[in-house]
């Protein structure tokens, strides 16, 4: 996220918004390492990652960047410990429940990329609801890659 912040700050200082990208893509990686470095449990690292994501979404929308793609949960993430996967599933629920109204107010369109069918019922429902509620929105397109893996694209 450091490069994103540097690019945005640089453009804002110069008031050169034409040089901002139309589409920003971020791989959410390193939350566990961050937590370990700060002597916190992995779940706290993921929570901090979600807080940073909220910030990035707001800045991206404020700057009128057209699309933001977040690679949040790969197909390989299912192989993590049961506790970590459970914490990530709870974060999905918490994020959408707390953010959906603001995202709707900001006219954000949400697209979930990846196989939704494998998610537990509540998570699957909240993902489908977010897509359906925002389908007609015309502002920022927020692509969230969940249960997504590049290997699936190769077949």
PLM segments and residue spans:
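Flexible, compositionally biased loop and terminal segments
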Residues: 1-155
């Amino acid at each position: 996220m450091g490069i994103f912040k540097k690019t945005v700050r640089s453009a804002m200082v110069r008031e050169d918004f034409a040089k901002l990208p139309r589409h920003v893509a971020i791989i959410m990686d390193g939350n566990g390492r961050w937590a370990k470095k700060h002597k916190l449990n992995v779940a706290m690292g993921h929570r901090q990652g979600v807080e940073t994501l909220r910030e990035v979404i707001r800045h991206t929308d404020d700057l009128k960047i057209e699309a933001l793609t977040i690679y949040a949960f790969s197909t390989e993430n299912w192989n993590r410990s049961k506790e970590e996967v459970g914490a990530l599933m709870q974060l999905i629920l918490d994020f959408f429940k707390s953010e959906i109204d603001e995202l709707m107010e900001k006219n954000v369109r949400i697209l979930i990329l990846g196989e939704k069918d494998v998610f537990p019922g509540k998570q699957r429902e909240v993902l489908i609801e977010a897509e359906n509620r925002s389908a007609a929105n015309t502002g920022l397109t927020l692509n969230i890659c969940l249960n997504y893996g590049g290997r699936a694209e190769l077949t």
